[in-house]
From Swiss-Prot:
GO terms for cellular component: cytoplasm; endopeptidase Clp complex. InterPro entries: ClpP, ClpP/crotonase-like_dom_sf, ClpP/TepA, ClpP_His_AS, ClpP_Ser_AS. Belongs to the peptidase S14 family. Transmembrane segments: none annotated. Keywords: Cytoplasm, Hydrolase, Protease, Serine protease. Cleaves peptides in various proteins in a process that requires ATP hydrolysis. Has a chymotrypsin-like activity. Plays a major role in the degradation of misfolded proteins. Fourteen ClpP subunits assemble into 2 heptameric rings which stack back to back to give a disk-like structure with a central cavity, resembling the structure of eukaryotic proteasomes. It catalyses: Hydrolysis of proteins to small peptides in the presence of ATP and magnesium. alpha-casein is the usual test substrate. In the absence of ATP, only oligopeptides shorter than five residues are hydrolyzed (such as succinyl-Leu-Tyr-|-NHMec, and Leu-Tyr-Leu-|-Tyr-Trp, in which cleavage of the -Tyr-|-Leu- and -Tyr-|-Trp bonds also occurs). It is an enzyme of class 3 (hydrolase). GO terms for molecular function: ATP-dependent peptidase activity; ATPase binding; serine-type endopeptidase activity. This is ATP-dependent Clp protease proteolytic subunit. It is found in: Cytoplasm. The lineage of its organism: Bacteria, Pseudomonadati, Pseudomonadota, Alphaproteobacteria, Rhodobacterales. The gene is clpP. The active site is at residues 107, 132.
Length: 210
């Protein structure tokens, strides 16, 4: 049984109070960041998270289709199809989306990191990036297992094509790099083409990376 105090502390979201012409207004911290066009992609990627992220992207596009969106990523990865729904939405909307990894961008997290606008993909100095091929566990009749295995192969090929598109690496290099868990430092990720720049302080990129 989970400790109720731990559960409370882990789900406690800070509130911020803003003064307006109509008085005070309270926001949870993530809603306040959304007003600044900042989206936090934090934790495992799953259908619930992808729905929230896609909704935020579409909302910000509707508010201003020409103003950039900043996405902060700290994720171990997760469900491939959920991640692809976020990826497709990032490519679909009109605003440019900058990405910044804080902590880690592993598995689908790394794909979403490199899916940011070219020249606007960043990492903090001590962040880690990990790429690998998709995996899955299936059970049931042998025929069904074979069907799922073929689907996983198709997803693997599609993911490889996306990495090729955004990193500039050739297909053979991507396939070799994703064969096993491949951990990278920020410097390695930049050299491989997953990101464009390593940020140590806001400086001149303040307006782009938020």
């Amino acid at each position: 049984m989970k400790d109720p105090i731990d559960l409370y502390m882990n789900t406690l979201v800070p509130m911020v109070v803003e003064q307006t012409s109509r008085g005070e207004r309270a926001y949870d911290i993530f809603s306040r960041m959304l007003k600044e066009r900042i989206i936090f992609l934090s934790g495992p990627v799953h259908d619930g998270m992808s729905s929230l992220i896609c909704a935020q992207l579409l909302f910000l596009e509707a508010e201003n289709p020409s103003k950039e969106i900043a996405m902060y990523i700290n994720s171990p990865g997760g469900v491939v199809t959920s991640g692809l729904s976020i990826y497709d939405t990032m490519q679909y909307i009109r605003p440019k989306v900058s990405t910044l990894v804080i902590g880690q961008a592993a598995s689908m997290g790394s794909l979403l990191l490199t899916a940011g606008e070219k020249g606007m993909r960043f990492s903090l100095p001590n962040s880690r990036v990990m790429v690998h091929q998709p995996s899955g566990g299936y059970q049931g009749q042998a025929t069904d297992i074979m069907i799922h295995a073929r689907e996983t192969e198709k997803l693997k090929r599609r993911l490889n094509e996306i990495y090729v598109k955004h990193t500039g690496q050739d297909l053979d290099t991507v396939e070799a790099a994703l064969e096993r868990d491949n951990f990278m430092s920020a410097e390695d990720a930049k050299a491989w083409g997953l990101i464009d720049e390593i940020l140590e302080s806001r400086g001149k990129t303040d307006d782009t990376a938020k």
